Amino acid sequence: MKARLTATLQRAWNLGPDRWLLGAAALALGVALLRPTVAIERPLFNHVVVLDVTQSMNVQDAVVGGKPVARLDQAKQALRDALLQLPCGSKLGLGLFTEYRSYLLLAPVEVCANLQELRATLGHIDGRMAWTGNSEVAKGLFSGLAIAQQLPDKPALVFVTDGHEAPPLDARNGPRFNQEPGDVPGWIVGVGGLTPLPIPKIDPLGRPLGFWRADEVLHADPRSASRDATPDTAKPQGSEHLSSLREAHLRRLAAETGLKFMRLQESASPGGSPGTSLGAALTEPALARPVPARADLRWLPALLALLLLLARHLLQLRHLRSLRQSAHLSASANPTSA
C-alpha cells in the first residue's frame, strides 16, 4: 500500500511543477468559491442627530467651501459628508429641535442601505419647520436625550445647535436635568461664529422679512423680568436680537448631561470630507458598539491562486529561457561548415 502511494506521488511529481502549480491554483479558487468566513466583532455606531431649526440658525456666519452660509446649512453639509464615514451596519436617525422640545423625524436606519433616504430627509430639513420664535435649547436637549433613551437600541445623541436661548435663560429659573448624566452618550455640536449678528426674520414660507429689531424680542426671562420689573424695563435693553455661538452655555449643558462638546468649524466643499471633526466624532471609539459579524475571507484563497498562477508563469519563462540558452550553446558547439 505504501509502495503504491509512493509510486503515485512519484508519477505525479514527474508531471512537473507546472501542473502542480496549476492544480493548486484551481484548488485555491475552489476554496474561494465556497465563501469562507470567520467570526469577528465589528465596531458599529448608532446615533440620533437632532438639528436646531430655530431662527437664529439662519444667521449666515458659517462657512462651507469658503463661502458664507447659514448655520443650519453648514450643519447639514457636515452631516451629509459624515454619513460616508460611518461603517456599513451602523445606524443613524434624524430629528429636529424647535420651540422647547426635540422631535424624531426618522428612527435610526442602516446608513449604507438607506443613504439616499437619509440624505433626502436631511435635504428637506429647513427653517420653515420652526413654527414659533421660541428657542429653549436646554429643554430641547433634555427632550432629545429622553427620545434617545426611549428608543429600542438606546442610540447616542448628537445635538446640533448654536445655543441661542429665546427667551433668555435665567439660571435661577432654568430647567433641571432629571436623568442620570452619561446614561445617553453623545455630543453637543456648537454651530456659528463668535461675533453677534442680526437674526433674519422669515415668513412661514421661508421668505426673508428683514431682521429682528431690539424692540421685537425679549431681553430677559419673563418670570425674572416680572419679578424685577422697574419703570425702565419697558425699554429694550440687551442684545438678544443678535446671535452668536453660545459656547459657554453649551459647555455647561454638556457637563450637566454627561455629553461631550465640540465646535463645528469650516466644512469642505460638497462631496468632500467635513473640514471639522464631525465624522471623527460620530465614529469615536467610545461610542462604538461591538457587534458579532462574519468577515469574508474569499480574498485569501483568491490571492493565493493569483500568486500560484504568477509562479507558474515565471517558471515557464525560466524554462523557455533555459531552452533558448541550450539551443544557443548547441549551435555554438556545432557550427555548420560554409
What is each PLM-predicted segment?
Residues 2-43, 280-338:
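C-terminal signal-anchor/stop-transfer transmembrane helix together with its immediate cytosolic
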Residues 38-55:
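Alpha-helical transmembrane signal-anchor/signal-peptide segments
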Residues 61-72, 81, 104-108, 125-134, ...:
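Second-shell loop/turn segments in exported
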Residues 44-45, 57-91, 110-114:
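…and closely analogous acidic/polar surface helices at protein-protein or active-site interfaces
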Residues 46-50, 255-298:
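Juxtamembrane amphipathic/hinge helix adjacent to a transmembrane helix
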Residues 90-124, 147-148, 274:
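Short beta-strand-loop
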Residues 29, 52-54, 75, 94, ...:
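DG-centered beta-turn motif at the end of beta-strands
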Residues 163-248:
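VWA/integrin I-like adhesion module and closely mimicked acidic/polar interface patches used
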